[in-house]
């Protein structure tokens, strides 16, 4: 070998772990006291690999890594875990795992390993799946079958004809609770079953009770409509001559008009708007019938009390028209002469 081509190595203060056991530490000048026979450290990475290996460095070069032959001999077709194959080469492990997970296990002929080609996988797994005795979802109920059974129990609605409804209504007008014999006879006439006739009467009674309750509620809300009938009150169009005779001309024989009470106590149209037979107004209000005793009664229409002691003759017509509500409506249309008295 050529010693000039070899790279010089400087020994540091510490020899390191690769120093020999019999070597001594170097002196302060960096030279050993005795022949040290030191060996340099082997290269650890690319930083030390730039020096060429020559001479005594060759035995210390690392050898290329080789896989152990013993490990390759023990290695099987699949990965090894704790001394046994993981899932490909061990069927017992798969059975234990499937039993622990409570899932049905497929037969071995129905499945292929991940390393098998597409030719080894069966195209139709139907017969293999049919061999399973455990259902795919044993804990879930079959909701589709339950829905079918419920839909079958539902009965169709019965459509009654006009003749059947008439016959049923006739019997219902007679009695709301027909006995079994009457229901059977009615079922024969209407071509229905006795059960359908009974159900129809139950529904008809419920409908009748509902209408009765609704009618009572309406009567309780509007009691005036049942106590008084508006049609009995006189209308204005039925007495057109009453409007002309209410206010006679100033030249007539009765200056007071029909709004004054006659001595006989017959009420005038202005005092009694309703056609009730109460006698005179004074008697109806609970006061004596004498017009001279209480002249203040005539102040209702604005007449002075002095007119209470005078007696007036009835109107020239001689007949008293039936009073009505129109007299109250005509009250604001009093003649100017009567309005001047009140002021």
From Swiss-Prot:
Q: Which organism is it from?
A: Mus musculus
User: What PROSITE patterns does the record point to?
Assistant: HOMEOBOX_1, HOMEOBOX_2
Where does it reside? Nucleus
Give the protein family: Belongs to the paired homeobox family.
Source taxon at top rank: Eukaryota
Q: Where is the composition biased (Low complexity)?
A: 12-38
Protein's gene: Alx3
Q: What does this protein do?
A: Transcriptional regulator with a possible role in patterning of mesoderm during development.
Say if the entry is tagged with keyword Nucleus. yes
Q: Where is the segment annotated Disordered?
A: 1-122, 309-343
| Single GO BP term | embryonic forelimb morphogenesis
Query: Which one of the record's GO molecular function terms can you name?
Result: sequence-specific double-stranded DNA binding
Q: Which residues bind DNA?
A: 153-212
Q: Does the keyword Nucleus apply?
A: yes
This chain belongs to which protein, by name? Homeobox protein aristaless-like 3
A single Gene Ontology CC annotation of this entry is: nucleus
Indicate where this protein is primarily found: nucleus
Task: List each coiled-coil range.
Answer: none
Taken from the record, one Pfam family name reads Homeodomain
Key words, A-Z? Developmental protein, DNA-binding, Homeobox, Nucleus, Transcription, Transcription regulation
Q: Which SUPFAM superfamilies match?
A: Homeodomain-like (SSF46689)
Which body tissues produce this protein? Predominantly in neural crest-derived mesenchyme and in lateral plate mesoderm. Prominent expression in frontonasal head mesenchyme and in the first and second pharyngeal arches and some of their derivatives. High expression is also seen in the tail and in many derivatives of the lateral plate mesoderm including the limbs, the body wall, and the genital tubercle.
